Amino acid sequence: MKINCLFCCMSHRRFNRRSSSRQSIKDCIDAKNNITTFDNISFKTDSSRRRYISEEIAKLGKGNISAHIFTFRELCVATKNFNPDNQLGEGGFGRVYKGQIETPEQVVAVKQLDRNGYQGNREFLVEVMMLSLLHHQNLVNLVGYCADGDQRILVYEYMQNGSLEDHLLELARNKKKPLDWDTRMKVAAGAARGLEYLHETADPPVIYRDFKASNILLDEEFNPKLSDFGLAKVGPTGGETHVSTRVMGTYGYCAPEYALTGQLTVKSDVYSFGVVFLEMITGRRVIDTTKPTEEQNLVTWASPLFKDRRKFTLMADPLLEGKYPIKGLYQALAVAAMCLQEEAATRPMMSDVVTALEYLAVTKTEEDGQTVEGEEEEEEDERSKL
C-alpha cells in the first residue's frame, strides 16, 4: 500500500520541526559515557542501592535535574497512606495513586513501583533522567521522585482522563463512553508528536521502546502525553545504524526485527505506533484470545484487509457507529499500514506520520457534510462512470 501520495498532497502543511538547535541531552550529560550506559549501572550492595540512588541521579544529571525530591512521609500524607480509594491504576510496575502535595500545591499522580516488579533501579534512574532532561507538550511532566530506603516512587502531573487504554479497550470496566473519530485522530496526532520529538529533536535521539495505549495519558481535553520512560533507550550515534539490546517491551507491540535480533532503531517505535493506531481505528486489542484463532493477533488479522480497499469499512470500530469520514478512514488505515511494514527501512519517519495525522485531526467529521453511506454512494457512482 502506498502512502507517498498522501504525504505529497499535504506537503504544504509540513512544518520545519527539526529545530536548528536540537534539544541536547549531551549539554547536560556526557552521552557517550553516561546515558548510553544505563544498562551497565550497578549497585554493589543493597545498602548502596538504598542509600545512594539520589546521589547517582544528581551525578548523572550534572546538576540539571529539576525534579523535586520527596520524602516517603510526604507522599504518605499526599495519598492518605496510599489509600486504595485513591488508586488510579495498577500494572506490572506497581500502583498509581491520586495525591495532593503541598509544595508545589497541586494534584498529582504517584506511581509506587513494586519492589518485585520489572521496573528496578536502572529503569527508575532512566525514567527520572529522561523526564527531567526532555520537555515537550506531549511528554508527561515529572514533578519529583522519592528514593527513601527501598522505596522507588515517581510523582507526575495528574492527567484527568487516565490512559488511552481506559477509553479504548477497557470501556466496560471503566464505565467510559467510546471516543469519537475526531478525538481518536487528535490523540493519535499528539502521541505521534511526542515520538517525533524523541526521535528527531532530542540529541542524541531517544527510542521510547514501550509505546502502547496504557502509556498514553490524557488530560481533561484529551490532549495526550507519553509516560513510563523506564525502558527508553538512547538511539544510535556516530554513524551507527542501530542499538543492540535485550528485547524488552510488551508482546504484540514490538517490531519484528527487534523481537528477532534485538536490533533497535527509531523505526521500531514507528512499528509500535502503527499497532496502537490500528487499535484506535479498529477498537481491537493487539492480542485478544477471546476472538477466533485467525483474529487473535490484530496485525495478522488486518494484513489481508489492508490489500482490499472495499473491506476498509470492516476494520472500523463498530462503536463508532459509522460516524467517521470514509476518506479519513482510508487515509488513517494507509498510515497504519505504512507504519506496520515488515522492513524497517520502508516505514515512514515520525515527522511524516505527524504531517499525515495533523491533517486528519483538523478534518472534522461534522465538517464533511456527508455520512459514511453518502460517501460510499458517491464512490460507487464514480466507479460506474469508468
From Swiss-Prot:
Q: Which Gene3D superfamilies match?
A: Phosphorylase Kinase, domain 1, Transferase(Phosphotransferase) domain 1
Chain's role:
May be involved in plant defense signaling.
Tell me which Pfam families the record gives: Pkinase (PF00069)
Entry's family note: Belongs to the protein kinase superfamily. Ser/Thr protein kinase family.
Q: Where does ATP bind?
A: 88-96, 111
Q: Where is the composition biased (Acidic residues)?
A: 368-386
Lipid moiety-binding region for S-palmitoyl cysteine? 5
**Protein kinase domain location, by residue?**
82-360
- Which is one Gene Ontology cellular component term of this protein? peroxisome
Subcellular location, record wording: Cell membrane
**What residues form the membrane-spanning segments?**
none
Identify this protein by name: Probable serine/threonine-protein kinase PBL23
Record-listed E.C. numbers:
2.7.11.1
Example GO BP: defense response
Q: Name one GO molecular function term.
A: ATP binding
Catalysed reaction equations from the record? L-seryl-[protein] + ATP = O-phospho-L-seryl-[protein] + ADP + H(+); L-threonyl-[protein] + ATP = O-phospho-L-threonyl-[protein] + ADP + H(+)
Provide the active-site residues from the annotation: 210 (proton acceptor)
